[in-house]
Curated annotation (Swiss-Prot):
<comment type="function">
    <text>Specifically methylates the adenine in position 37 of tRNA(1)(Val) (anticodon cmo5UAC).</text>
</comment>
<keyword id="KW-0808">Transferase</keyword>
<dbReference type="InterPro" id="IPR022882">
    <property type="entry name" value="tRNA_adenine-N6_MeTrfase"/>
</dbReference>
<comment type="similarity">
    <text>Belongs to the methyltransferase superfamily. tRNA (adenine-N(6)-)-methyltransferase family.</text>
</comment>
<keyword id="KW-0963">Cytoplasm</keyword>
<keyword id="KW-0489">Methyltransferase</keyword>
<dbReference type="GO" id="GO:0003676">
    <property type="term" value="F:nucleic acid binding"/>
</dbReference>
<dbReference type="GO" id="GO:0005737">
    <property type="term" value="C:cytoplasm"/>
</dbReference>
<dbReference type="GO" id="GO:0032259">
    <property type="term" value="P:methylation"/>
</dbReference>
<protein>
    <recommendedName>
        <fullName>tRNA1(Val) (adenine(37)-N6)-methyltransferase</fullName>
        <ecNumber>2.1.1.223</ecNumber>
    </recommendedName>
</protein>
<keyword id="KW-0949">S-adenosyl-L-methionine</keyword>
<dbReference type="InterPro" id="IPR050210">
    <property type="entry name" value="tRNA_Adenine-N(6)_MTase"/>
</dbReference>
<keyword id="KW-0819">tRNA processing</keyword>
<dbReference type="Pfam" id="PF05175">
    <property type="entry name" value="MTS"/>
</dbReference>
<dbReference type="InterPro" id="IPR007848">
    <property type="entry name" value="Small_mtfrase_dom"/>
</dbReference>
<dbReference type="InterPro" id="IPR029063">
    <property type="entry name" value="SAM-dependent_MTases_sf"/>
</dbReference>
<dbReference type="GO" id="GO:0016430">
    <property type="term" value="F:tRNA (adenine-N6)-methyltransferase activity"/>
</dbReference>
Length: 245
């Protein structure tokens, strides 16, 4: 058997240091989660919260990027996804640092006794309307269960004074969340606009918000270059995770 076929298992996705099984998760490993996990600022991070963790992908990426004392809590509403995330964590090198909770994050936040220096979320972004094929996928991608206002409420309750709240969203949804956040007193600190290639406008945005003002760093990135190969910027961002790079 080819070593590549042995590594690229059909029920999930193999990264350099861990494997993500996602066959029981509504949302599979995708570009958005990988970008957020590789991009979120981790300097001086003490404790991390991943809201809507799904398969546990972003939590494990952040575990790889942070040092031994850092603890990571991952909260996921769907029972099957949370169970699979727990299994993925248990099979990883960071099982002692990543803790998966199956819970509604709005209720969980009310009883949480910790604050976090980094909160990340790849949140729902479709408004109610047409529904997905499965109720689990609807929950994962439609704001009927977790609106952006509710997400900001949770982040405000749980964030450290000098912490960062990071999300990835489609460009239009990101603009709306950013407007809501600024109205509530958040400050934009980092923003990366992402285009599929250099002939198209940005269709995703990475945002890092903080309760505290500070220098703004704004940039942009394309995922693929004119030759349809991954761009140098994308390769630099994700090289610690993707195989064969």
């Amino acid at each position: 058997m080819s070593p590549y076929k042995a590594i690229l298992r059909p029920n999930g996705f193999t990264f350099k240091q861990f494997f993500i099984a996602h066959d029981r998760c509504a949302m599979k490993v995708g570009t958005d989660g990988v970008l957020l996990g590789a991009w979120a600022p981790v300097t001086s991070v003490k404790r991390v919260l991943d809201i809507g963790s799904g398969s546990g992908l972003i939590a494990l990426m952040l575990a790889q990027r942070t040092s031994e004392p850092v603890q990571i809590d991952a909260v996921e509403l769907d029972e099957e996804a949370a169970t699979q995330a727990q299994e993925n964590v248990a099979a990883s090198p960071w099982a002692h640092r990543v803790h998966v909770q199956q819970a509604d994050v709005v209720e969980w936040a009310q009883r949480c006794e910790h604050s976090y220096s980094l909160i990340v979320s790849n949140p729902p972004y479709f408004s109610p309307g047409s529904q997905c094929a499965s109720p689990e996928r609807t929950t994962a991608r439609y704001t009927t269960g977790l609106t952006h206002e509710m997400l900001l409420d949770c982040a405000e309750k749980l964030i450290d004074e000098d912490g960062f709240f990071c999300v990835i969203l489609p460009a239009s949804a990101g603009s709306k969340l950013l407007e809501q956040a600024l109205q509530r007193g958040w400050h934009l600190r980092f923003r990366t606009d992402i285009a599929d290639n250099d002939t198209r406008p940005a269709n995703r945005v990475l945002l890092a918000l903080s309760p505290q003002p500070g220098e703004r760093l704004l940039d942009s990135m394309t995922i693929r270059g004119p030759d349809r190969q991954y761009s140098a910027a994308h390769c630099r961002l994700t090289r610690d995770f993707y195989l064969f790079r």
